[in-house]
Amino acid sequence: MAFAVVAALWIPASWAQSAEATAPCRVPGVAHEVRCGVVHRPLDPAQPGGPAIDIHFVVVPAVARRRLPDPVFLLAGGPGQSAIALAPAVLPLFARLNNRRDIVFVDQRGTGRSTPLECDDRRHASLSEPAGIDAQVAQLRACLTRLAATAPLRAADDLRFFTTTIAMQDLDAVRARLGAERINLVGASYGTRAALEYARLFPQRLRRSVLDGVAPPDMVLPVSGGIDTQAALDAMLVDCERSPVCQRSHPMLRADWQSLLASLPKPVSALHPLTGQREHFTLDAERVLAAVRGPLYAPSLAAGLPQAIGEAARGRYEPLLGLAEALASRRGGTVAMGMHLSVLCAEDGPRLERDLPTGSSGAGGASTPAPFIDLAGQLYRRACAFWPRGSVPEAFYVVPPAASATLLLSGGLDPATPPRHADRVARALGAQARQVTVANAGHGLMGIGCVRDLMFRFIDAADDAHALGIDATCVAQVPRPPAFEPMKGLPPALPKPSASRAEEDAR
């Protein structure tokens, strides 16, 4: 009895508060029991007595008894991904952090369990279904009408209340509900923008932050994404031209890419990568550009692009379509498009027309960023013309000097958030920023063992000085996957065992 009293007195109040704020639960894909909670937040922060929105979160308790009081929060990307849906994939990467720290997954308003603003998931649709800009805009208009009638929304204008600034106020409400004085943030892609906004709003509550694939608040995604995607594609083409093995197998790769674009649109047939059924459809530049952009995120998939582009130029489209599907099919890859547009139309939309170049790409303009800019720019320009836009404070676009240590991670081959974005964010953050670039990595570095170790040592360091001084030389050893080479036939059969050897094996 006395031991129980002493033990109870030893437990910090924050842990007791965390237990009271959550209840045991299960998350699909996570083997063990976790704890789930919810905070009730006003839909419109200016009307605290108005309709409320439930912000759901999951806490994965630390393994060790002597836990540390500063949990690690994951901020998902997209914008529009569910952090809770990513838990099964992320927890193995956070295993060392989870030894002594709770890991917290918060579904940002508009995602996952927190009033998901989801449109129809078209990722696995039939190849014959229209996939062009006109079809996508029509689908988004229909989605807007449906979302406007979804509780707790009262009208389409309520989609204005899903901006990053409001979401980070929700996140701090979760922190307070758990009783944590300070927290660590790990943001990925758009999650880095969210982390920067949390740091701006609540610097005193932030202990450390890791930004994986830095997306600055003033980055205009449709424009920068087009430029950076083309740069990543050009780097892949140049790498193949410089590689004796790739050049020998694909001597006309750049010409194949240009001739493929120049031949579009055209009627084709191909086997669907998921169903295996042959479908007849019109292949256009929008579908090809989207199919190429996805694999560029992961160098292991991009290694298959030389073969896939060459095959497509010769009329066989299954390899290219299959590569695109490989990325789209990953766990947690679904994006709530309603939330996605509510964020980007409010935060990027006002700057889109200013930064979007004029002119068209032309069929063979593979050496300019125009094709990829046109692909995203047209869609966002037209969608944001009718999508409700929230209010964004001017201070949102300015990154202030960091009050705590911040680790910025970039992949040199990233088609979405390459190092150039982290460069200027690091300059703005000042002396408390540490930037690490992995030259041969793509979008999202946490899956690399060396980087996971860096992240753990950065967060676990006793003070900011030691955190900023971690040794990151291991990143130079990360290789770029060589271009995929198909098998040139079956390997030779193994020789049959002799009769005496067969008798011995039988015994």
Feature roles, as predicted:
Residues 2-13:
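Bacterial N-terminal signal peptides
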Residues 17-287, 342-344, 348-507:
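Gly/Pro-rich cap/lid or specificity-loop segments adjacent to the active site
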Residues 243, 312-320:
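Short, solvent-exposed helix-helix connector turns and helix-capping sites enriched
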Residues 256, 260-263, 291, 308, ...:
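Charge-rich, solvent-exposed alpha-helical interaction surfaces
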Residues 272-291, 297-301, 331-338:
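Structural motif
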Residues 296-311, 350-356, 463:
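Short helix-capping/linker segments at secondary-structure and domain boundaries
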Residues 317-353:
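Long, low-complexity segments enriched in small/aliphatic residues
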